[in-house]
Swiss-Prot record:
Biological process, per Gene Ontology: protein ubiquitination; regulation of seed germination
Molecular function per GO: hydrolase activity; protein heterodimerization activity; ubiquitin-protein transferase activity; zinc ion binding
Record protein name field: BRAP2 RING ZnF UBP domain-containing protein 1
Gene source species: Arabidopsis thaliana
Alphabetic keyword roster: Coiled coil, Hydrolase, Metal-binding, Transferase, Ubl conjugation pathway, Zinc, Zinc-finger
Chain's gene name: BRIZ1
Span list, region Disordered: 453-488
Biased composition, class Low complexity, residue ranges: 465-478
Description of the deletion phenotype: Viable heterozygous plants seeds are slow to emerge from the seed coat; emerged embryos remains white with unexpanded cotyledons thus leading to growth-arrested seedlings.
Length: 488
């Protein structure tokens, strides 16, 4: 049973039958009867969105009565069929349909999908049995693929639509990619041709919007991993078309599965499909090594190349199984021994690389330290020489200043002595002048007295002369006498 999630980018729009009939359609090239079987209660709507198709991880073959529902999903309808052309394709089985929703994707203009809801389970089963696997047009290659849908969810968020429900895995919506999957995986029971991507049928398909189909048709181009660019062991995701290298290279393909949970990947060289969840191949067809033709692939076959003589699906399962198990055991032992020896060699090799790297690191560190020490010593030596030059200059200046200091000291002492002598001579001169002034003053006063006495002669005549006591001669008079003598 399938679950459908639609990332809607707009709301549902009703479709007018009259407007559709007035337009040009692919079917209008031929004479088509008018649409008289459409019930008035039929709801025809159109919507744009991106479809995500999910199926239960525990696969089971179809048809299965317990996995039916009244909602059917047509995977891919070619765009040359208009809405009314598709209704004409359904013919009289459209009478019991209650709702038809056409889902279109702007990124896939060559096809659209259809969601049909029936009012009765028997009518849904009849529609499925009569139209599933039928060509849309006799001259075209496209086949109608119908799936039973358990539930349909519409969301405006791409993250919600792209997240797989618990226990479900996402399937591609391209019909060719679905047909190449195992029936237990895709839910498509049969196919009209092998779709080996080299037959004329594939070239007539118009689904060039499928990235995987374009990659398979580009036989002349060299395909490479979209992450690392490797050209060997390249795989393509069936759901989104991501191209990555296998697990024996950089493992970008399996990394993509872990990130997006898109578990189906196509080997672009062998056209084989691998299921990462089931850890096995799930492709419907395999190419024979002998004649290059496509042969049916058993789902229980364990061999990569589809050679059932080496696995449990052969006729004699007991003997073949024992032989296969013994071969597997011997190969496992051989590869374990080889792996152990290789790991030991790799360990020794990487240990030697580590030792060499450490020695190189230590030598480089020692050289760097030595260079730093040399540079530091050179800088210190330059500073010492500069300081010594400054010291010698300062010493010379200091010596010169000391000499000048002694000279100025002598000059100052001489000046002090000269000033002291000059001051002494000035003091003596001042003292001498003072004594002279006093003498002159005494002389003048004595002269005045004598003049006065001369005018009064009578008093002198009647006077008495008395003796005057002799006093020691003052030093000043002695000095004056010396000076007077000196002057003489």
């Amino acid at each position: 049973m399938f679950i459908l999630r639609v990332h809607s980018v707009d709301s549902e729009r009703p479709i007018s039958v009259e407007e559709e009939e007035s337009g040009f359609t692919y079917a209008s090239k031929r004479a088509q009867p008018p649409l008289k079987l459409i019930q008035p209660s039929l709801k025809l709507t159109d919507r744009k969105g991106l479809i995500h198709l999910y199926r239960k991880s525990s696969h089971s073959s179809l048809p299965n009565p317990s996995s039916r529902s009244t909602t059917l999903f047509i995977v891919a309808v070619p765009n040359y069929l208009s809405s009314l052309d598709f209704i004409r394709f359904c013919d009289s089985r459209i009478s019991q349909v209650s709702d038809i929703l056409f889902i279109r994707n702007d990124g896939m203009e060559d096809r659209y999908s259809v969601l049909i809801t029936f009012s009765d389970q028997s009518e849904a089963d009849g529609f499925y049995n009569n139209l599933n696997g039928k060509k849309f047009a006799p001259s075209e290659a496209e086949v109608c693929h119908i799936l039973y849908v358990m539930s349909v969810e519409h969301t405006e968020f791409d993250e919600v639509a792209a997240e797989a429900p618990t226990g479900f895995t996402e399937l591609p919506t391209c019909p060719i990619c679905l047909e190449r999957l195992d029936p237990d995986t895709s839910g498509i029971v049969s196919t009209l041709c092998d779709h080996s991507f080299q037959c004329s049928c594939t070239s007539k398909w118009t689904y060039l919007s499928c990235q995987v189909c374009r990659l398979c048709q580009q036989q002349d181009e060299i395909l490479n991993c979209s992450i690392c660019g490797k050209t060997e062991n390249v795989w393509a995701c069936l759901v989104c078309g991501f191209v990555g290298c296998g697990r024996y290279k950089e493992g970008h393909s399996i990394r993509h599965w872990k990130e997006t949970h898109h578990c189906y990947s196509l080997d672009l060289r062998t056209q084989q499909i691998w299921d990462y969840v089931g850890d096995s191949y799930v492709h419907r067809l395999n190419h024979s090594k002998i004649d290059g033709k496509s042969v049916e692939m058993s789902t229980s076959c364990l061999s990569h190349q589809g050679d059932c003589g080496l696995c449990e699906c052969s006729e004699d399962t007991g003997i073949s199984g024992a032989i296969f198990n013994s071969k597997v055991d011997s190969i496992v032992i051989e590869y374990n021994d080889l792996l152990a020896s290789q790991l030991k060699g790799q360990r020794q090799y990487y240990e030697s690389l580590i030792v060499e790297a450490r020695s190189k690191q230590e030598s480089s560190i020692a050289e760097a330290v030595e260079q730093i020490v040399v540079n530091t010593m050179q800088e210190l030596q330059n500073k010492i020489e500069k300081c010594e030059e400054e010291k010698s200059g300062i010493t010379e200046v200091n010596t010169k200043l000391i000499k000048e200091q002694d000279t100025w000291r002598k000059k100052a002492k001489e000046i002090e002595e000269r000033e002291a002598a000059l001051l002494g001579s000035k003091d003596e001169m001042i003292t001498d002048l003072q004594e002279q002034i006093r003498d002159i003053t005494v002389f003048i006063e004595a002269k005045k007295t004598l003049k006065k006495m001369s005018s009064d002669t009578d008093g002198i005549r009647e006077g008495t002369v008395l003796p005057v006591p002799i006093s020691p001669e003052p030093v000043s008079s002695v000095r004056r006498q010396k000076k007077s003598n000196r002057r003489k």
